[in-house]
Amino acid sequence: MKTRIKLYAVLTAAALLTGCGAFNSSESTETTTENKTTTAASDTTTDCCEDKENDCCKDEPADCCGDSAEAVTIGAPEKTDINIGHLNSTAHLLAFVAAEEGYFKEEGLNVTLTQFSSAAELVNGIESDKLDVAFVGSVPTLTFQSQGHDISIFGGAMTNGHGYVIKSEYADEDELGVEILKGRNVASVKNSVQDAELQILLKNANIGIGEGKDEVNIVYFDSQKDAYAALSNATIDAASVYSPYASLAKSQGYRVVYYCAHEEALQNQPCCRQIAKTSALNSNPNTFTAIERAFIKAYHFTQTDHDKTIKDVKKYIDIENDLIETEVYGGYSVSSPDPDKQGTVTLKDTIVDLGYTDDYDIESYYNTDIYKNALASIIAEGSDDIYKELEEHFNEYE
């Protein structure tokens, strides 16, 4: 899972863009359990140097003296009824698994999941207090932040998972690249990773955007659902996709133009992020730490039980199991809770350079303490290679 952000020129770095859209609606609730306090390290520290002549704070393990960096005490959630908004993506499985495997309940939370069609709808839900948490694409998140909206990133949801598909009469095999889009009408979503990635690849290939025979004509739609549905129109030849549309398209006879995970210029970009009101993160830290603990546990589950993960995802994204397996475990995307701050800050700088949004100070809109404390508390309860890998990644890319 060690995602490494590769920096190329501004053109390549611009691939660090994101966005997502709509499918079928579903929701899930968890029964509230008794509020509890989770302690990452014992509240009372045993003096392991008692009756010894040596200096325990110099010669013994750090936590012997109660100064371990992992000692984090998490209080009971300030709020237990939580509404989480997601898109129609298999990549948002952290919420699905946390609900179905009872991890929200373990954290004393009563959670309702609701599917939305676009980033704008999700952000509106956050700002109107209809949602407490939302999985939103990085680019729209950054754009809304630059406009002064009170939303902050506190975790991750997906890396990669995008591409384009084309009608089979224009391609006899998959992954022929953007050259086959010349002279075609391509459906996409404005201000999304799909759109930005395509524009980067076209520019790198010296292919213009327009209606000429050697150009690519991009036709914009309000959501990924609408862009994909436009393939049924005779005037649209190709369309953007994100998980699970690529697999769905292949099952319906379309060809994949490219997977972003397979394009060197587009690999490992931070995609959808966990967002919440900045003010809510500040006033209810225990609640969001509990939510993050549930997401981290869900990630661990996805790495250890593939079959049950697929069943959990299917309850929210109702497509065939083999398509879910391809999207989740086929190497096209990664669903990790890590906030991936370095990569997202690089993304912000990139889209500013590209004119997607105005520059702004992202520091006050990025909260990594929630994830840091949640992960530390889980590791203190009992760690393994999966949790250690999350810790290593966070320490390297915070």
PLM regions and their residue ranges:
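Short, glycine-/small- and polar/acidic-enriched structural segments
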Residues: 66-220, 237-243, 256-260, 267-268, ...
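Bacterial lipoprotein signal-peptidase II cleavage site
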Residues: 21-33
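Histidine-centered metal-binding segments
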Residues: 42-68
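Sec-dependent bacterial lipoprotein signal peptides
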Residues: 1-18
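Pocket-lining segment of extracytoplasmic ligand-binding domains
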Residues: 138-140, 226-315
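Secondary-structure end/capping motifs
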Residues: 282-360
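Conserved C-terminal helix/tail region of periplasmic/extracytoplasmic solute-binding proteins
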Residues: 352-398
